[in-house]
Amino acid sequence: HFEAAYPDVSVEPIEFDFADPTAGLAGGTTEVALIRPPVDLPEHRMLVLDSESWVACLPRDHPLAGRHEVEIAELLDDPIVCAPLTAGPWRDYWMAMDARGNRPPTIAAVAATYEAETTSIARGLGISFTTSSVARFYDRPGIVYVPIVDRPPSHVALVWHPGTLSPQADALIRHVQQNWGFEDGDETPLDQH
């Protein structure tokens, strides 16, 4: 663990809502963050730490709620609960804009947290697209999660700006690289995902 290897360095976990999917990197309030691309940070680098499949979060009485899996096209006409406009390309990604062609989504509600999102869905306002881990952590009465079989995986990445790192942040990145089996040069520009 990083703090055992570097006892004089404190890692401060800070949670950001959907309004800032860059987790403070864009505004410079954080040096290193765990995020889900895509985000608009062209000068940043990342290490992809994990990948997850997409799921649909549906009201329990939705016509497809009893299915074992769905395709994205089956859900594109449903009203959607989405992130705030400030989320930029991240919002578009989670509304599956790439699969919609020129059909704009019907926005049922805007939610800046998973709690607000799942509450809106449980109330029957709309659906959302998210990841399989959210299905494990945010199960609640009134909603059901159904795997989406035809979406590329969503990635979890450690992200940083290489030109502005403190020695402590650089040590954290090197620690992750060494302990997760990454080689020098395994990091990629953020715009490649």
Role assignments for model-derived ranges:
Residues 22, 26, 72, 117-118:
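Short hydrophobic/charged patches on amphipathic alpha-helices used for structural packing
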Residues 10, 28-29, 48, 74, ...:
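Conserved functional loop/turn residues at catalytic and ligand-binding sites
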Residues 144-193:
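A late-sequence structural motif
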Residues 44-54, 58-80, 167-170:
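Flexible hinge/capping segments at coil-to-helix
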Residues 17, 71, 112-113, 131:
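Short loop/turn segments at beta->alpha junctions
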Residues 1-41, 111:
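Central regulatory/effector-binding core of bacterial HTH transcription factors
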Residues 41-48, 52-53, 114-164:
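Beta-alpha-beta core module
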Residues 36, 65, 70, 79-101, ...:
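Secondary-structure junction motif
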